[in-house]
From Swiss-Prot:
InterPro entries: Aldolase_TIM (IPR013785), PdxS/SNZ (IPR001852), PdxS/SNZ_N (IPR033755), RibuloseP-bd_barrel (IPR011060). Keywords: Acetylation, Cytoplasm, Pyridoxal phosphate. Belongs to the PdxS/SNZ family. This is Pyridoxal 5'-phosphate synthase-like subunit PDX1.2. Homodimer or heterodimer with PDX1.1 or PDX1.3. No interaction with PDX2. The modification N-acetylalanine is found at A2. One of its GO terms (molecular function) is protein heterodimerization activity. It holds the Pfam family SOR_SNZ. GO terms for biological process: pyridoxal phosphate biosynthetic process. The keyword Chloroplast does not apply. GO terms for cellular component: cytosol. It comes from the Eukaryota. It comes from Arabidopsis thaliana. Expressed in callus tissues, flowers and roots. Weakly expressed in leaves and stems.
Length: 314
């Protein structure tokens, strides 16, 4: 998959030295505006939808945003950006921010999405990859971009390219298996904790090791976190899953369209939204988890998952 870092030395690099605020020293730089727009979503759940009715239901359940997806998942084959007609219909139907996905490296799809005035563009490996060698230069767009990552190096390379929000990605198959998401979130958070205890020479060496821009690595050390909003994605299907991601240090969660399968999707979505907002209150989480025994009935975690446990590195 494409993983090429930008070579423009300082273009769009976030420079923040104000506690945990995510800002840009150049207040008139468009990137600071895009990062600020992404920060508005902190503490929320972003729900994948493939119809207007699903978008309305997600909004009524309290989703902070909806991400429009190609509804033909079941056909297999190449997945692309959603039909512009569907995007326009969703935008007319809801008042929450609307996101849409473009294939990795497909800057023309991104141009089309920006012309449709979507609020955010997700350059997504969840759909098909258009360019194996290049990511989109996100500084060329007015719209804030979201990019997936599985570790700190990937996250910082995507930020250097102009990503205003990071999606820590786990399972891509909509099976409801949260294990890979937990692994990747813990890996990223763990690397940041180790980074916090490094001296300047060690930071430089670490930046080379993970192939990340030194200035962003140093910035991450100072902040104690990656310098943009970070959401978790993949296998998050219950209130407990959502609360786990928040307690591990994420700013919010993506909820896949599989949440609409089975009975009472509104109740499931509402419970997940409440869990994100009250992730440290086990009494609220117990209440939100009650009566959801059918929430996972349409999801099939890979049967040999338990046998695999302990066989690989942790």
């Amino acid at each position: 998959m494409a993983d090429q870092a930008m070579t423009d030395q300082d273009q769009g690099a976030v420079t923040l030295y104000s506690g945990t605020a995510i800002t840009d020293a150049k207040k008139n730089h468009p990137f600071s505006v895009k990062v600020g727009l992404a920060q508005v979503l902190r503490g929320g759940a972003i729900v994948e939808v493939s119809s207007v009715n699903q978008a309305k239901l997600a909004e009524s359940a309290g989703a902070c945003s909806v991400i429009v997806s190609d509804p033909v998942r079941s056909r297999g084959g190449v997945r692309r950006m959603p039909d512009p007609v569907l995007i326009k219909e969703v935008k007319r139907a809801v008042s929450v921010p609307v996101m849409a996905r473009a294939r990795v490296g497909h800057f023309v799809e991104a141009q089309i999405l920006e012309s449709l005035a979507v609020d955010y563009i997700d350059e997504s490996e969840i759909i098909s990859v258009a360019d194996d060698d290049h990511f989109i230069n996100k500084h060329n767009f007015r719209s804030p971009f979201i990019c997936g990552c599985r570790d700190t190096g990937e996250a910082l390379r995507r930020i250097r390219e102009g990503a205003a929000m990071i999606r820590i990605q786990g399972d891509l198959t909509a099976t409801g298996n949260i294990a890979e998401t937990v692994k990747n979130v813990r890996s990223l958070m763990g690397e940041v904790r180790v980074l916090n205890n490094m001296d300047d020479d060690e930071v430089f060496t670490f930046a080379k090791k993970i192939s990340a821009p030194y200035d962003l690595v140093a910035q991450t050390k100072q902040m104690g976190r990656v310098p943009v909003v970070q959401f978790a994605s993949g296998g998050i299907t219950t209130p407990a899953d959502a609360a786990l991601m928040m307690q591990l240090g994420c700013d919010g969660v993506f909820v896949g369209s599989e949440v609409f399968d089975g009975p009472d999707p509104f109740k499931k979505l509402r419970s997940i939204v409440q869990a994100v907002q009250h992730y440290n209150d086990p009494h609220v989480l117990a209440e939100m988890s009650s009566g959801l025994e059918n929430a996972m009935e349409s999801l099939n975690v890979r049967g040999d998952r338990i046998q695999d446990f302990g066989q690989g590195s942790v």
